[in-house]
Structures are given as C-alpha cells and as structure tokens.
A protein has these predicted regions:
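N-terminal export signals
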Residues: 5-25
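A short, basic/flexible loop-to-alpha-helix module at the beginning of a structural domain
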Residues: 24-36
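N-terminal Rossmann-fold NAD(P) dinucleotide-binding loop
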Residues: 49
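Aromatic pocket-lining residues of Rossmann-like dinucleotide-binding sites
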Residues: 56
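Conserved N-terminal/central alpha/beta ligand/cofactor-binding core
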Residues: 61-62, 68-168, 172, 222-223
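Flavin (FAD/FMN)-binding glycine-rich loop and adjacent Rossmann-like elements that form
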Residues: 100, 119, 132, 139-140, ...
Length: 483
C-alpha cells in the first residue's frame, strides 16, 4: 500500500470503526449559559493569536485564548517554521517590526534561544545562502519559544485553553458574542465581548458569514511544506561545499537552483529524487550543528479541508524521508545526519483571505503606501509560491520603498461587529498577503488586534468605530515602530 492508498483507506476508514463503551457526547443546550465568560476571546494560539492575547491582557482586558494543539506558537512551534523572516526595513538599517515581537526576540536571545537579527545577514548559513530579502532573519529554538510563550501568557494573566477546538461562532444581531468549543470534557460555550480570529484560516469569520476568498480565488493555493530539523552534521564541511558552489545559484523559468542543486541533479538522474524541487534549502539553527530544512513542496493542499490536509501530512513525511536519504548520500558532512523531528503539523502558506473594512493591495505594498491608521510597518517582499500551476515556480518581488504600512481596517472584519482579524487571514489581495503572511508581520497584527480590542472595552466602542489615531498612539507608546 503506498502513501496515497493509505490515505484513501486506513486513515479515513478508521473513523468508521465502532467504539464500544463510549457514551454519546451531547452538545450543551442553547439556554444562554456559558461555561466561560471573558472580555476578549482569541481563537488560535499561533504567533498572531498569542501576541493578540498578551497585548489585550496587558491593556487591561480579561482574555481567553483557545488553541487546538498542546502548545502555543502555531507554525513557529508545531510547524517548526523558521527562522523568523526579516523585521528590518528594506535598507537593512532599522528594525521596524518591534513591540511584542522585539520583546520575544530579546527574551529568547537572553536565554540562548535565538540569535538577534541585527547580526544575521543574507547569503550565509542562517539564511540558507539566500541573499534577496533574507537580511536580518531571526534563527530561534522552537522548544525555548514554547516555554517563553507559556511564561508571557501567565505573566499577563491570559487564560489558555489547549487541546480545545473551535466549533462554531456565536453571533447575535450581527455581533460576535462568543463561540462553541470542544475539548476533552466535551462541548463548552464561551461568552465574549470581542472576538479575535487568529486561526490562520479565518475559520471564525468564515463560519460567521464574513465573505472570504480561498487562495487566489480561482482554486489555486500556495503549496504546503513539511519542515524538519537535522543534527549530527559536520557543519564546516557542509558550509565549505556551499561556499565553493554558491556562485552557480540561479533561477530559470521561475524555478530556483540554489543549495546543493549540483547534487540534486545527480540524484534525479539516479532515480533518487522525486520531489518538485531542484535544490535543498538548509538554515543553520541556534545549536552548533542543528539545521532546519525548509524545502518540500506539497501542491494542491487546501488546509481548510481535513482530507486534503491529511494528504499533506503524509506526503510531507515522505518528502522528508527522500531528503534525509539524499543528505546522507550526497551532501558533505551529512553522512551521519540524524533527523531530530518533523513538524507536528505541515507548514501552510495560504488558505482564506477574509474581507475587512479595508483591503491590503499588492500595489500599495510594492510602492510603500503608509495609511494614516497603519498599525505596523514592514518591508517583507511579495513572496508567492506555486505560480503557473507549478509548485517549483516562485515569484519574489522586493518593494520600491523602504517600508509599507498596514491599515487597522484590514483587521476589522466586514459585516460582523466585534470581530477582529490577526495573521495571514487578514483582509488583503492574495499577492499582498504573500508579503505579510510571515511571522513577524503576523505577530505585529496580533499586537494591534489585541490592543484594539482592549481599547474598545475601555472607551465603550466597537472595533469598527474605534478611532485609528488612538490605537496608533497606544501602539507607539508600547514599543511599536510606526515611522
């Protein structure tokens, strides 16, 4: 049975097996009672969600964050996605994504869990020798990040519910007022004054009836990637091989030929490489001989669909096996390489784009437009994978200015009151979202959404009616760089 047959049979059929001795789990009666009451409900504990929760709590709100896995951090911890992409301006001179993101980086650095981006440059091992757009990335240890995020939520007084799945929104008279959840104890209801959708997929907004676009709107989504970590490598030999050959890096018809493409060609000829890639990108980690591999491409994945996501997980592990065999056979310094771990969830670049009161447009990103109510500035390039229906093709466009801004109104969901967005599901054109989908901008969005929610409660208004100047002033006072 191959991996695709396994998905068609074993995984799906298992759900139909009878289970003796289990009592039926009943939904709570719709009697208006809630097991939890909170000011701000954050749905999703990834990079955006955890920053939203901490920011809201630090600004005086009672906060509950709901996370379906057993840890906070989302793609950064579960998915092993790293490093944090650049947080600097285009010139590489100034750190512009600051606030909570900078605090997290500094606290990780202080405990040996990260390298500060000021000392990390493109075209070197910490950036997979990619020069364009990869200055000042932040290598970090996901295990240290897990613990740090737990600590920061506890310090802020955030209530965290792990192993708890969002089931459906509770919307009354056009207002988000809570959610139905499911966890080990069965169904629970939570009542909230403001909800922040930080699910990445826009699950709350979509189920609440907010208009959404899936992928590019024509059925195409960026490919997924299974990240994995490797150790027991002779880093000196690996680095020497790359340095001796990096002058051959090139791009042809949108396909990148970067790290170890000279060996990938040999592996293809030998029938030992069936992956939709022509290179292998390795990022040096915080540990001396620990490396992170961001290389697989799994096309056609709709992460809003469980069957499609299941396929991606299985295919991602297959691709990891192919790459590990390749490393041990072909790459200098890797003959005794050890696979430390694969992500506990596959890395997802794109699903739904939720409609908001404003839309981030790709032309504004490229041309450095800074709206008056910008809640963060960024210089991340427009990075779209999987163009021309080919998972190997990528489009990477740097911006024409030193930075651009993202309007607060891109985080205010359209048509449902008291609902904010944070993370890659923000309101934006698909290509524009391709710039801010990476983790530093998502964390800045989270801080902005959480701060906005707390301010709304303080002054007695809704997110839609909140004065942008008040939010911008508060964010700047709390460490955000806004020009």
């Amino acid at each position: 049975m191959n991996r695709r047959d396994f998905l068609k049979g074993g995984v799906i059929a298992a759900t139909a097996m009878p289970m003796a001795g289990l009592a039926a789990v009943k939904e709570p009666e719709n009697d208006g009672k809630a097991q939890y009451e909170t000011d701000v409900l954050v749905v999703g504990g990834g990079p955006a969600g955890v920053c939203a929760a901490i920011a809201a709590a630090r600004n005086g709100a009672k906060v509950l964050v709901v996370e379906q896995s057993g840890m906070l951090g989302g793609m950064a911890t579960q998915g092993l996605v790293g490093p944090f992409m650049t947080c600097y301006d285009k010139a590489g001179e100034k750190m512009i994504i600051r606030g909570l993101f900078e605090e997290i980086v500094n606290r990780l650095v202080a405990r040996g869990g990260a390298l500060h981006p000021k000392g990390v440059f493109g075209n070197g091992p910490y950036s997979a020798w990619i020069p364009k757009g990869h200055d000042h990335v932040t290598p970090f240890d996901p295990e240290e990040l897990k613990v740090l995020l737990d600590e920061m939520c506890a310090e802020a007084g955030v209530k965290v519910l792990l192993h708890t799945t969002f089931v459906e929104p509770v919307v009354k008279d056009g207002r988000a007022v809570g959610a139905k959840l499911f966890g080990k104890g069965g169904y629970k209801c939570v009542a909230a004054k403001i909800v922040i959708d930080a699910t990445g997929d826009g699950d709350y907004a979509y189920r609440a009836g907010v208009p959404c676009v899936l992928g590019d709107g024509n059925g195409r989504l960026m490919p997924a990637t299974m990240f994995f970590r490797v150790c027991n490598i002779d880093s000196e030999k690996l680095i020497a091989d790359i340095e001796a050959n990096k002058h051959t890096f090139h791009k042809k018809d949108g396909v990148s030929y970067r790290g170890f493409h000279w060996y990938v060609t040999k592996a293809i000829e030998a029938g030992e490489w069936d992956l939709p890639r022509r290179c292998l990108n390795m990022y040096r980690g915080v540990g001396q001989d620990v490396w992170l591999v961001n290389n697989g491409r799994i096309p056609g994945v709709d992460a809003t669909d469980a069957e499609s996501l299941s396929h991606a997980e299985v295919e991602g592990r297959h691709q990891t096996k192919v790459m590990m065999d390749f490393l041990r056979k072909y790459v200098p310094g890797c003959k005794d390489a050890i696979l430390m771990c694969t992500g506990s969830t596959v890395g997802i670049r794109e699903t739904r784009h939720v409609s908001g009161e404003a839309m981030l447009k790709v032309d504004d990103v490229i041309n450095g437009v800074v709206p008056e109510d910008s809640v963060f500035l960024a210089a991340n390039s427009v990075d779209v994978h999987g163009g021309k229906n080919n998972p190997m093709v990528s489009s990477y466009q740097t911006i024409n200015a030193n930075w651009y801004g993202v309007s607060y109104r891109c985080l205010v969901a359209k048509g449902v009151e008291n609902l904010l967005l944070a993370g890659r599901c923000l309101s934006g054109e698909p290509a524009a979202a391709g710039a801010v989908r990476v983790m530093p901008p998502c964390m800045a969005m989270g801080q902005a959404a959480g701060t906005a929610a707390a301010l709304c409660l303080k002054v007695g208004t809704t997110p839609r009616a909140l004065e942008g100047k008040m939010l911008v002033k508060t964010l700047a006072a709390q460490g955000a760089f806004l020009g």
